[in-house]
Amino acid sequence: MSDIKVLALDLDGTLTNDQKLVTPRTRAALDAAIAKGVTIVLASGRPTAGIQPLAEELGLDKKGGCILSYNGGKIVDCRTGETLVEKTLDPALVPELCAFAAAQDIAILTYNREGIVCERDKDEWANKECFTTKLPMIHVDDLASYVNYPVCKMLITLDPARRDAVCAAGQQQFAGRADLYPSSPFFIEAVPRGVAKDDSLAELLRRMGLTRENLMACGDGLNDRSMIAYAGVGVAMQNAEQPVKDCADYVTTADNNHDGVAEAVEKFILRED
């Protein structure tokens, strides 16, 4: 009998294929896991509103489950809508992050209840976030002035060739005040200091009376490393970046386009010993 009670799943490059769809075999594996009493946590850098449609598609609003959004900045109960965990950026950092992006001549965005907020509505890389989240782009003239509400993260979008250099510069400038790290070839996350998927999952497990040994986590990106290393069973997709594979207990033989999540769920949760 599996000790896994919580299954945390990254979305893009993990649960969904490159068309942003959950395949039938993977959906069936998740339904079977839920039937065994496993709580599904959709754990992503996406905003909450960008995860909600998938949660509803999987029936988590009725069967139960959680949305972990903003790479751990917020956790919401799918069934009740209750916010279980929320961590926001220091408001003073918002204009400084905007100025940093402007100095680098790159786009930076954040979110409100209606969609994605950005000064550059035609930016190629910023529009990738619209495709990923299925949220509309809201163009504003001055993002720093517009953001007068708490935000869980800001997202820098840029040409992949510039990612590492810009990220290093940002990490130096905001050291000790915010965490900046890449989450895809063209995204750099800016989140409150110490916010990560593992930290928020640990808080959720405490609320549930469970431990890390009851957690299985699946992911592919650098922002998934913390939860994969933390989980009792950490799983990296075949398509994961090498540092992610290096910290995993198991690497799937299939990638996200060929039911890698289903492979892991069948192996560690559904298999009867």
Predicted regions and their residues:
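Short active-site oxyanion
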Residues: 37-41, 63-65, 153, 213-214, ...
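Short, structured coil segments at secondary-structure junctions
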Residues: 58, 63, 71, 174-176, ...
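Short, hinge-like loop/turn segments at secondary-structure boundaries
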Residues: 57-61, 85-86, 125-129, 197-198, ...
